[in-house]
């Protein structure tokens, strides 16, 4: 579209939600030559009157936006999702909230220590399947586990057909098996309790420190919320 001298000229485009901060959204505008990062807000009349809470944009959503030459962006519509995670709204009477969308795989991250819990794994598997994506169980801290095969066998019996990767994000052992899920155009979300090594795992995947990490207690292998 050819621009004129009118600074308020509007252009419509498709964008990806990369972060949500209350009423402000960080978006990546898809263009032919390069992508542009912008801040955006919702078109109030559309989202607060015509749509329920489930339709509010979340990380991973593709949305239709309207921009002007000043760099202002307005989110007009949330495009159909291929997968989505929901959480219950803490406000009584309000609809559940979408927290992540359009991912291909759900990495169910569990550590091979005292924190491993089969009931929790069942809940994770159910959530992953209900999201519409494919679950992959990531067993972390292989370098600290004397019998990783024990945990792998437990998962394989509990979730037949689900891929299992036993890894050490510290030594890199087993990380090559994870790479097959990270091809071009693929998106992954991580699900796991505190202290299982999600931040360390992400840093290992990225090859650099992109997330802070925290220590766990030795007596029960519990961790602090870092990711």
What are these regions (language model features)?
Residues 72, 132, 161-163, 210:
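A generic structural signal for alpha->beta connector loops
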Residues 134, 141-196:
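Canonical P-loop GTPase G-domain recognition
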Residues 12, 185, 208:
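Short coil/loop residues immediately preceding or within conserved phosphate-binding loops
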Residues 208-227:
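Switch I (effector-binding) loop of TRAFAC-class P-loop GTPase G-domains
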Residues 1-118:
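N-terminal accessory targeting/assembly segments
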Residues 194, 199-200, 204:
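Walker A/P-loop
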Residues 99-104, 108-160:
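Phosphate-binding glycine-rich loops and their immediate beta-loop-alpha structural context
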């Amino acid at each position: 579209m050819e621009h004129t001298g009118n600074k308020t000229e509007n252009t419509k485009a498709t964008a990806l939600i990369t972060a949500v901060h209350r009423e402000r959204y960080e978006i990546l505008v898809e263009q032919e030559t390069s992508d542009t990062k912008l801040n955006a807000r919702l078109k109030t009349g559309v989202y607060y009157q015509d749509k329920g809470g489930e339709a509010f944009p979340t990380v991973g959503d593709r949305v239709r936006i309207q921009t002007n030459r000043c760099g202002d962006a307005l989110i007009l519509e949330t495009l159909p999702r291929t997968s989505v995670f929901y959480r219950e709204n803490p406000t009584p009477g309000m609809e559940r909230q979408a927290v992540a969308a359009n991912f291909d795989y759900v990495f169910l991250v569990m550590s091979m220590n005292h924190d491993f819990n089969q009931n929790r794994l069942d809940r994770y598997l159910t959530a992953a399947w209900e999201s519409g994506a494919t679950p992959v169980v990531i067993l972390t801290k292989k370098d600290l586990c004397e019998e990783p095969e024990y945990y792998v066998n437990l998962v394989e019996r509990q979730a037949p057909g689900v891929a299992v990767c036993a890894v050490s994000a510290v030594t890199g052992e087993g990380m090559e098996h994870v790479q097959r899920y990270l091809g071009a155009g693929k998106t992954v979300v991580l699900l796991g309790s505190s202290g299982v090594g999600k931040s360390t795992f992400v840093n290992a995947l990225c090859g650099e420190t992109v997330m802070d990490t925290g220590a766990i207690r030795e007596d029960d292998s519990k961790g602090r919320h870092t990711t």
